[in-house]
Amino acid sequence: KEGYPVDWGNCKYECMSDAYCKDLCADRKAKSGYCYKLNWSCYCEGLPDDSPIKTNGHCRPGGRRK
């Protein structure tokens, strides 16, 4: 699957570079990843089906963990 990976607080990962997102997505077993610069968030492609991605729901910033 593909989408914006989220942390424990259901928050997307902010980015400024593709390299950061590529590493973040690789850590989550995705095939590729990049920084989607229209909203400055990491986007992953080829994620495992059980990987959490952004859906409807609020970001709870206190839950940030990598």
UniProtKB/Swiss-Prot annotation:
Disulfide bonds join C11-C59, C15-C35, C21-C42, C25-C44. One of its GO terms (biological process) is defense response. It comes from the Eukaryota. It is found in: Secreted. One of its GO terms (cellular component) is extracellular region. Keywords: Disulfide bond, Ion channel impairing toxin, Neurotoxin, Secreted, Toxin, Voltage-gated sodium channel impairing toxin. InterPro entries: LCN-type_CS_alpha_beta_dom, Scorpion_toxin-like, Scorpion_toxin-like_sf, Scorpion_toxinL, Scorpion_toxinL/defensin. SMART domains: Knot1. GO terms for molecular function: sodium channel inhibitor activity; toxin activity. Expressed by the venom gland. Residues 1-60 form the LCN-type CS-alpha/beta domain. SUPFAM superfamilies: Scorpion toxin-like. Alpha toxins bind voltage-independently at site-3 of sodium channels (Nav) and inhibit the inactivation of the activated channels, thereby blocking neuronal transmission. Has the structural arrangement of an alpha-helix connected to antiparallel beta-sheets by disulfide bonds (CS-alpha/beta). Belongs to the long (4 C-C) scorpion toxin superfamily. Sodium channel inhibitor family. Alpha subfamily. This is Putative alpha-neurotoxin RjAa44. It comes from Rhopalurus junceus (Caribbean blue scorpion).
